[in-house]
Amino acid sequence: MVRISKQAGNGMTRRGLLQGAAVGGVGIAGASLLPAPTASAVGASNGFVFPGVDVVIDGSHATTDVTLLVREYLARKSEADPDGTMTFFSRNPVTYIDAVLGWSWYDWDSLRTALGQFMPNWPKEGKSYPTRILGNSTGAMVFFTDTAGLFGSSEIRAVGVINFSDRRITRQIDYWDGRHFGISDTAKLRVPTDKFPADFRESTVGETAAQTMKNVSYKLARALRNGDGAGAADLFAPGAVFEDVPAHVQIVGPRSIGSYLTGTASLLPYSGQGTAVRHIVGSATGGGYEWTAADGSASRGVIALELDSWGKITRLTAMWDGSQADDSMLVSLSQKAIER
């Protein structure tokens, strides 16, 4: 079964809502009907909602503590409060990189200075809010949206790979689709190629992901590197969903997923011999890995994974910079999703 989707991975499905309600321990579905809380009430027992935004955070594959921590962090960011936002970051080590634009900060003071320059210019109603969180308090994949006006005329729907130590962020790398933001707007903001960071500082935080997440990530990455769609399909649960955000493709079921991965082995930027795992985060049920590619349309990106209790993939979301790919490649990726 194949569905061509809009910006996948940032909505709240009925399945995810019900799962989140079961995991969260509080009445999430009921909480979504409550008036939006003020930012000062963000830590209250009001379910996984977000102040000022009509959204229910999908925390079905995250621990409650990291969901609340991320919500508090982004609520403070949404208040355009540089000092408050920086209380969520470690003094040392700290790394923050935008993997699309190449903007980078490697110490607390420089990041604080940057926020102090950005935030006063944000629109009053601007928000940076989470929609889905995968992982635990050591590391998580955070799907979040920066509304229009924060960093340009369009919204940014990103996946942040975040490492934590003692409830402080030690490393955050943001991946998003430059086509959704606008190809020309993205190009204007991107640093020159010779200035783009080569080291994403994963060595400063180490590999703390759960062993199950590591095992699945490495097996999947190896199958994709070898163009082994059938081997990759074996890692998926019967009702699994595969979604590639820049390609606007969603596929359901291992057989169809395997067929698609076989047919696109030479097209997908995270498939082929030049690909490698950069860093893994998450728990035994939610997380994923950053990847790099020596060749192809995009040189870096992220694979977010939801796993069931047997370690099978129930949902895979791929995020990379589609502005680096030409139209014909994206058309080919869509055509390969047509089943026969």
Set out the residue ranges of the language-model regions.
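A solvent-exposed, acidic/Ser-Thr-rich amphipathic alpha-helical stretch
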Residues: 68, 79-139, 229-284
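Short, solvent-exposed loop/helix junctions and linker helices
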Residues: 11, 60-64, 105, 210, ...
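N-terminal leader/capping segments at the start of a protein or of a new domain
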Residues: 18, 27, 32, 46-50
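A beta-strand edge to alpha-helix "cap/lid" segment located at domain peripheries
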Residues: 45-57, 116-211, 265-273, 278-340
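N-terminal secretory signal peptides
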Residues: 1-12, 24-31, 38-40
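Short, low-complexity N-terminal intrinsically disordered segments enriched in polar/charged residues
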Residues: 22, 41-83, 87, 182-230, ...
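N-terminal export leaders
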Residues: 14-21
